[in-house]
């Protein structure tokens, strides 16, 4: 079906800029953008349907390129403890922290995980999200990582959005491998990844490169295996310290390196050369009350593409609003509203390996877009909360009005 969408203004986000078109029209057909431009330049078109957008601003559908949306349990009690002065180490010694989420996730059935994740993902969708990534990483064994990734696939099947599933088995050391990190990495490489990839459950491979998680050498073993399996890689890097994990990610042409508060100029140069996207996660920065800022000037100076994401997870960023992350990116990291919007559209698409099909409003790309009740694109980063989406369109079909 061919649809003409008109009486709107468009921020195409081509090349990471607003690239605004006033009084625009969009023609969609077969799920793709067939034509876009000033309405005055549109030749007569035979449309099956014409939609008047009432002067709304239209942007690409938002893309949340880093989430841990599938998990069991709830850690709000730990939030209260931390506000009362209990340290993370003390909470962990009590059996809390990521270990508590692993226990709850392992104990939950696939249907239970699906039901809770479904609610969280729907909250993101109400904010204009049409594409998101979901990581595993709270199962930490084959059966439970499979369970999490199956939930991600089910969400893609049952909700009108695009989901990319990332295997993050190298998120933390499971209790049964305490003190044996090398053995656990070998288990992931020899058994878990081949099995999960063989079942078609994995779109990318991620790891957590930190002193409290896995070393660069261990991560590299994982990357080598991912490359053998034909899977792209991503990396949690430089969140708490500088191990040059982002440079390691760049050497393996990673789609992205994420967090990056402690990255160096050398890391930025490597990422720029490899085309690796810097995914910044202001929700975790805010929630943990961190003080070390990502090196924004170095990222800009070397032309590294910058994305933003919610990092939705139960321990460090229980954020259900990607639009809130736009504001946090501006207020916490000194991004411009234009940079922030590019960070959840065109650059987020690149961070998921979808840059050729998603993330900007251009002829031939997927017709995912949002019509917003705003006066200008900067409003998306300006307003805190509120119901701003007027219509959400995925593959040329309205999913919200």
UniProtKB/Swiss-Prot annotation:
One of its GO terms (molecular function) is zinc ion binding. Its cofactor is Zn(2+); Fe(3+). Its EC number is 3.5.2.7. It comes from the Bacteria. Fe(3+) binds at residues 66, 68, 236, 311. Pfam families: Amidohydro_1. Its main location: cytoplasm. Keywords: Cytoplasm, Histidine metabolism, Hydrolase, Iron, Metal-binding, Zinc. It is found in: Cytoplasm. HAMAP family: HutI. This is Imidazolonepropionase. It comes from Pseudomonas putida (strain ATCC 47054 / DSM 6125 / CFBP 8728 / NCIMB 11950 / KT2440). The gene is hutI.
């Amino acid at each position: 079906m061919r649809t003409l969408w008109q009486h709107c203004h468009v921020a195409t986000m081509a090349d990471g800029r607003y690239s605004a078109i006033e009084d625009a029209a969009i023609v969609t057909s077969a799920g793709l953008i067939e034509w876009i431009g000033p309405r005055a330049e549109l030749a007569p078109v035979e449309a099956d349907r014409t939609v008047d957008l009432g002067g709304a601003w239209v942007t690409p559908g938002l893309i949340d390129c880093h989430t841990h949306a599938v998990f069991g349990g709830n850690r709000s009690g730990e939030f209260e403890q931390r506000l009362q002065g209990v340290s993370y180490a003390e909470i962990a010694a009590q059996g809390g922290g990521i270990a508590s989420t692993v226990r709850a996730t392992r104990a939950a059935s696939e249907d239970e995980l699906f039901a809770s994740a479904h609610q969280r993902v729907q909250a993101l969708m109400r904010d204009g999200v049409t594409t998101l990534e979901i990581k595993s990483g709270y199962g930490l064994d084959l059966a439970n990582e499979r369970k999490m990734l199956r939930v991600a696939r089910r969400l893609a099947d049952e909700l009108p959005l695009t989901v990319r599933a990332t295997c993050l088995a190298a998120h933390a050391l499971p209790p049964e491998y305490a003190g044996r990190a090398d053995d656990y990495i070998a288990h992931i490489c020899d058994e878990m990844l081949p099995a999960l990839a063989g079942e078609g459950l994995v779109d990318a491979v991620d790891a957590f490169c930190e002193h409290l998680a896995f070393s660069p050498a261990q991560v590299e073993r994982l990357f080598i295996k991912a490359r053998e399996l034909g899977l792209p890689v991503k990396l949690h890097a430089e969140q708490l310290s500088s191990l040059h994990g982002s440079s390691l990610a760049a050497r393996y042409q990673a789609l992205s390196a994420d967090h990056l508060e402690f990255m160096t100029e050398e890391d930025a140069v490597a990422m720029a050369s490899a085309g690796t996207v810097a995914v910044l996660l202001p929700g975790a920065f805010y929630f943990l009350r961190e003080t070390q800022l990502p090196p924004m000037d170095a990222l800009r100076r070397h032309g590294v593409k910058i994305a933003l994401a919610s990092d939705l997870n139960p321990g460090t960023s229980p954020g259900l609003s990607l639009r809130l992350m736009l504001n946090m990116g501006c207020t916490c990291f000194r991004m411009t509203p234009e940079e922030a919007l590019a960070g959840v559209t065109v650059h987020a698409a690149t961070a998921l390996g979808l840059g050729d099909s998603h993330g900007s409003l251009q002829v031939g790309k997927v017709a995912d877009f949002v019509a917003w009740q705003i006066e200008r694109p900067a409003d998306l980063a300006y307003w805190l909360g509120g119901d701003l989406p007027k219509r959400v369109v995925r593959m040329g079909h309205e999913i919200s009005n």
